Amino acid sequence: MILKENYKLNNGVEIPKLGLGTWEIADNKVADAVKKAVKLGYRHIDTAQGYENENGVGIGIKTCGVERENLFITTKIQADFKTYEEARRSIIDSLKRLELEYIDLMIIHAPQPWTKFREENHYFKENIDVWKALEEFYKM
């Protein structure tokens, strides 16, 4: 069953092949969606700061009946956060909103701020600064 299958990443971490995407699920409804998905066998939950539902996702994780270490949680740094300090604060804020001690996968939501998408500045230097904050928080 595909819900029990994983991909192995280069660092040895396993990520479930399928995950519940929570985009456009309201914060006050997402906890129930998370609990139902986990009951069906999902172990990967994907959210983002931009979805504005990390609080509800955190509640769903806490109340789903599956131990945290058996879940894989992904969230994303806002696309317009492009400094080391913004990224660092962003990671801390996600941990607080989700009420988690760690996040399994934290990624940059988009290489350019949504309002600057397709413009000439590709934010290479800025994304390196954001990456440095991600590496600071990475724990294996």
How should these model regions be labeled?
Residues 88-140:
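Glycine/proline-rich, positively charged
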Residues 1-71, 88, 101, 133-139:
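N-terminal binding-site loop/beta-alpha segment at the start of enzyme catalytic domains
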Residues 54-55, 70, 81-83, 115:
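Short active-site-adjacent helix-start/loop capping segments
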Residues 24-26, 51, 81, 109-114:
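Feature marks short, surface-exposed loop/turn motifs that line or immediately flank catalytic pockets
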Residues 16-28, 77-85, 118-123:
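Active-site mouth loops of central-metabolism enzymes
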Residues 68-81, 102-111:
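A short, structured active-site edge motif that brings together acidic residues
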